[in-house]
Regions:
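Aromatic (phenylalanine/tyrosine) cluster motif
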Residues: 3, 21-24, 29
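Short glycine-rich phosphate-binding loop at a beta-alpha junction
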Residues: 90-97
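Acyl-thioester C-C bond-transforming condensing/cleaving domain
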Residues: 39-45, 57-88, 103-183
């Protein structure tokens, strides 16, 4: 589960700071770019903060948590790593990818945003594009920033496969006998 705060690096500030978390080395890097010698039309989308939760196993210690609860932990962590350089009030939107949202309630991205400490004023969207859901959220966030619709967006993916429900086909009831659960 990777969460990113995306932000437009505007050349008028002359200095753009980027906070990057390396998943592999588990270290945080603050990169500062001097933009005064760069193209004045600089409108690159940069990653301000990135966080992931541990990868759990089926029915492991994280299995009791719903996906939006894991998402909330990561959102809070990504915002905390910004060390106040961007306020939660500066966040324009949350876009989260999630494949299995059954039994999660309505709009799991919104639940993660609220539980992650973001204000009610920040809208949230849940994307389902199967395995590409988290990456699609990143793409949509970057597009919104590049088109000028937003300046700061929290994007990522959340999932807890241990919470995936089993389904019974009971729309028309069931007579006596065995019934199969669908996984």
């Amino acid at each position: 589960m990777v969460f990113l705060c995306l932000h437009r690096c505007i050349s008028s500030t002359k200095i753009c700071q980027i906070l990057i978390f390396s998943i592999y080395s588990r270290r945080i890097y603050l990169i500062q770019i001097d933009t005064k010698n760069m193209n004045e039309d600089l409108d690159d989308v940069v990653i301000l903060s990135a966080v992931r939760t541990p990868i759990g196993s089926l029915r492991g210690s994280l299995s009791v948590l719903k996906a939006h609860q894991l998402g909330a932990v990561a959102i809070r962590g990504a915002v905390t790593k910004l060390n106040g350089s961007i306020s939660v009030d500066d966040i324009n939107e949350v876009i989260m990818g999630q494949v299995l949202s059954a039994n999660e309630g309505q709009n799991p991205a919104r639940q993660a945003a609220r539980s992650g400490g973001l204000p009610y004023s920040v809208p949230a969207t849940t994307i389902n594009m199967v395995s590409g859901s988290g990456l699609k959220a990143v793409i949509l966030g970057a597009q919104a920033i590049r088109t000028g619709d937003a300046n700061v967006i929290v994007v990522g993916g959340q999932e807890c496969m241990s919470q995936a429900p089993h389904c019974l086909s009971l729309r028309h009831g069931k007579n006596l006998g065995d019934i199969s659960l669908v996984d």
